[in-house]
């Protein structure tokens, strides 16, 4: 097969030298296009910049000029970018100034290259990332997922933009704009990938906390709890409750986690919270035992811990023994720490091990057998003691509540 003939550009070059403003739309486009395609990048850039000055009415060559800039200054190794970042970002700004966000434009490719460079830094410059994203018009970005040659599906350009923009705004402490941007993202019928949607919800909820919109934030974090393991929703909710004078909610959440978590070094921070709770509630024995548990467990794992009380009376206890003592002091004396309620079981499914408790004037309260403090036989009409935590009903897509830390008090005979 014969090689394609390289176009002779002598006539264009002579005309350019004589009068650059005399080019027609087609001639200017063809000249810059051929220079770029023939690898004469520097000439394509020089000609393009001259046309911008001498023939501002011409537009057809712009994207070829932009790609010449992209090839020479943008599409290079990160090491080369780092040597002269001011030049790199200056050229990017030039491309953004003249090239529209459209098909055959180098704008998106140039911005994406810059974004990749920024994201490789540690720490990430979120101000620069946000500025780069602003070069693009988010509403007009492609919203169809990208599919590679192997048929694997990835996030769309629009999904990617909102994922990064919401994160950047949060990191920049632009909390109100972060919430507003996330809200806009939710209005689009996007097919979300990976955990992108949950991350957007997380940064939105975290911004709501900073804005003092605590109830909205609480609901969002509760909805994420148990569904998005990349973040510790318990820790966030605990701090939110403690910082908004809702210690009872915080302690209920804490004790429920303590009850279910068992004896494990990975729960050491929970044990420290238990100790602080016991101290705040004036439960001296539980506080001392919790301090003993923490100290012994840290020592067994090669670490040190300075207890805030005298532990001489418990020097012979192992960490496991101390845990059992703390568990008994807390779990079997819940009334010393959190609000307790009484109610009657009005439904129980023995096959699925869940049921509900009657609430006057409200929807019956859901519970699971696994949330009972002891392995008790639960029957309809049993009167139980329990505490309440907020949950998210995924089936009905709404906030709800459930009973936790239950124990059977007695069977109601008069039913």
Regions from the PLM with identified roles:
Residues 44, 129, 178, 217, ...:
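Single-residue signature of alpha-solenoid repeat helices
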Residues 14-23, 49-57, 95-102, 137-142, ...:
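Solenoid-like repeat scaffolds
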Residues 387-415:
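OB-fold/S1-family single-stranded nucleic acid-binding modules
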Residues 38, 72, 172, 211, ...:
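Structural motif corresponding to the intra-repeat A-B loop/turn of tetratricopeptide repeats
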Residues 303-344, 407-415:
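Short boundary/loop segments of OB/S1/cold-shock single-stranded nucleic-acid-binding domains
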Residues 360-378:
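Beta-strand/loop nucleic-acid-binding surfaces
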Residues 20-29, 57-63, 103-111, 153-164, ...:
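Generic helix N-cap/helix-start motif at coil->alpha-helix transitions
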Residues 35, 69, 114-119, 169, ...:
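Residue at a conserved register position within TPR or TPR-like alpha-solenoid repeats
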């Amino acid at each position: 097969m014969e090689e394609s003939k390289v176009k002779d550009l002598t006539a264009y070059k002579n005309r350019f030298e004589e009068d650059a403003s005399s080019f027609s739309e087609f001639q200017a486009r063809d000249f810059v296009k051929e220079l770029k395609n023939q690898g004469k990048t520097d000439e394509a850039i020089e000609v393009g910049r001259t046309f911008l000055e001498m023939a501002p009415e011409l537009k057809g060559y712009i994207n070829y000029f932009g790609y010449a800039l992209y090839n020479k200054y943008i599409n290079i190794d990160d090491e080369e970018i780092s040597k002269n970042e001011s030049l790199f970002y200056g050229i990017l700004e030039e491309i953004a100034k003249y090239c529209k966000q459209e098909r055959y434009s180098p704008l998106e490719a140039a911005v994406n290259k810059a974004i990749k460079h920024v994201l490789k830094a540690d720490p990430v410059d979120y101000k620069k990332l946000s500025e780069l994203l602003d070069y693009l018009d988010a509403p007009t970005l492609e919203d169809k997922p990208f599919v590679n040659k192997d048929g694997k599906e990835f996030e769309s350009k629009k999904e990617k933009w909102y994922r990064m923009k919401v994160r950047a705004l949060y990191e920049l402490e632009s909390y109100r704009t972060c919430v507003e941007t996330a809200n806009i993202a939710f209005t689009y019928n996007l097919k979300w990938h990976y955990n992108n949607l949950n991350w957007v919800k997380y940064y939105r909820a975290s911004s709501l906390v900073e804005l003092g919109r605590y109830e909205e934030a609480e609901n969002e974090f509760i909805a994420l709890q148990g569904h998005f393991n990349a973040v510790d929703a318990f820790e966030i909710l605990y701090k939110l409750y403690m910082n908004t004078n809702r210690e009872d909610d915080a302690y209920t959440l804490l004790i429920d986690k303590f009850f279910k978590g068992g004896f494990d070094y990975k729960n050491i921070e929970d044990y420290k919270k238990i100790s602080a709770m016991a101290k705040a509630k004036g439960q001296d024995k539980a506080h001392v035992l919790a301090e003993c548990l923490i100290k012994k467990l840290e020592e067994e794992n090669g670490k040190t811990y300075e207890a805030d009380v005298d532990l001489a009376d418990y020097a012979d206890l192992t960490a496991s023994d101390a845990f059992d003592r703390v568990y008994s002091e807390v779990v079997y004396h819940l009334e010393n720490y959190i609000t307790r309620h009484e109610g009657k079981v009005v439904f129980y499914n023995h096959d699925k091990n869940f049921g509900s408790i009657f609430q006057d004037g409200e929807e019956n309260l859901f519970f699971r057998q696994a949330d009972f403090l002891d392995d008790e036989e639960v029957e309809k009409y049993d009167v139980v003691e329990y505490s309440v935590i907020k949950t998210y009903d995924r089936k009905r897509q709404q906030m709800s509540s459930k009973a936790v830390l239950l124990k059977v008090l007695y069977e109601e005979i008069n039913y």
